Amino acid sequence: MENNSTKKALELRELPSILTREEMVDIMQREVYGYIPKVDFTMSVSDSEYVYGGYKCNSVEHSYVTMTISVGDKSHSFRVDRLLHKDGKKRPTVILNNFHRIYESRYFPIEEMTEYEADFITVCYTDVSSDDGDFTNGLAPLLLPNGRDTDTTCGKIGIWAWANMRL
């Protein structure tokens, strides 16, 4: 509950009006991250491959699928690991860009993370596109065939976000 002194203090600051979500997204894309590309694409997902089912007292299974994105005659595939509870209940799902593939990581806290009753979808960000200025590998040449050709073209964060929105 706002008291009168707080309300007066805010009025004295003459703050601008609050922007809409769309206006804020536009500002963040224009000034910080760049615009995420709009491309016509097709997507396919392989059948699930079982990895291990013994997490959290055998209630969480680790599996993966291979996702393929195609734009025109070019395509790129990457592995998407899934940590899903076996009971089939709908749960919150966390999408996680990971620095390592789960099966390569010496420590990935699966037990601790799934303790909070969420499922996890994770991808190693370098499988989507490398973390550098090279726009010729991974999804980069499909989404940005001309590389970063303007100041408002997204970089790798935008490419990773584009992929995450499709997981």
What are these regions (language model features)?
Residues K74-F78, L83-V94, E115-Y116:
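Proline/glycine-enriched tight loop/beta-turn segments at coil->beta junctions
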Residues G54-L83, A140-I159:
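Short secondary-structure boundary segments
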Residues K90-L167:
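Cap/lid segment of the alpha/beta-hydrolase catalytic domain
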Residues M1-S77:
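N-terminal targeting or regulatory segments adjacent to alpha/beta-hydrolase or S9 domains
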Residues Y33, F41, S77-F78, T93, ...:
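Aromatic-enriched hydrophobic runs in primary sequence
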Residues I69-D73, L84-K86, N98-R101, D127:
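Short, flexible loop/turn elements at secondary-structure junctions
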